[in-house]
């Protein structure tokens, strides 16, 4: 698996009030420290703050002020991907969100492949395969039943049931092996 730092637009490609650019990987904090300045325009290492904090300021690309933003810091493994993660909440115009993503790429990240954040969450043990599949199902749900089912699967209901069945099967296998090894001491 590649361990580089990835970035992508997390919101849809449409004009809206807010757009989100997500960054994840070993250099996510290095990237944001190159781009972020506080409300007074001073460079501040937001990466040194506690996990799960929000910072108001501005995103710069070099000396050019790109946009006003909120920056969320999530230190791994306590993030969706279980890696260091940053979310930049900016104004949601398509052009603005693309400019923020370009600044992130200039600062050292690469554009994520479709589904790569979820792939990393799976590979890092943050979610299991059933939950990874449920992410796509939640996104693509077209009715209430499909959405409810997908959310249940995302919360681990299918995985829990599989673990229960696995445990029961292993118990039965142990019972059968014991009966084969010493049939006189097994009562049915």
Give, region by region, the residue ranges found by the protein language model:
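A glycine-rich (often HGG/GG-containing) alpha/beta subdomain
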Residues: 1-148, 152, 156
């Amino acid at each position: 698996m590649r361990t580089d730092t990835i970035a992508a637009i997390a919101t849809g490609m449409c004009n809206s009030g807010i757009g989100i650019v997500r960054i994840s990987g070993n250099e996510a904090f290095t990237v944001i420290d190159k781009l972020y300045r506080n409300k007074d325009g001073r460079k501040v290492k937001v990466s040194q703050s506690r996990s799960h904090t929000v910072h108001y300021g501005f995103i710069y690309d070099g000396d050019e002020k790109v946009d006003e933003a909120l920056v969320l810091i999530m230190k791994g493994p306590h993030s969706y991907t279980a890696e260091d993660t940053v979310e930049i909440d900016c104004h949601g115009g398509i052009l603005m969100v693309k400019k923020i993503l370009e600044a992130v790429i200039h600062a050292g990240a690469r554009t994520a492949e479709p589904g790569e954040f979820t792939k990393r969450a799976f590979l890092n043990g943050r979610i299991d395969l059933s939950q990874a599949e449920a992410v796509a199902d939640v996104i693509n749900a077209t009715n209430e039943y499909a959405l409810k089912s997908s959310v249940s699967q995302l919360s681990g209901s299918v995985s829990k049931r599989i673990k229960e069945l696995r445990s029961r099967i292993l118990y039965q296998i142990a019972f059968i092996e014991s009966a084969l090894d010493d049939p006189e001491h097994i009562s049915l």
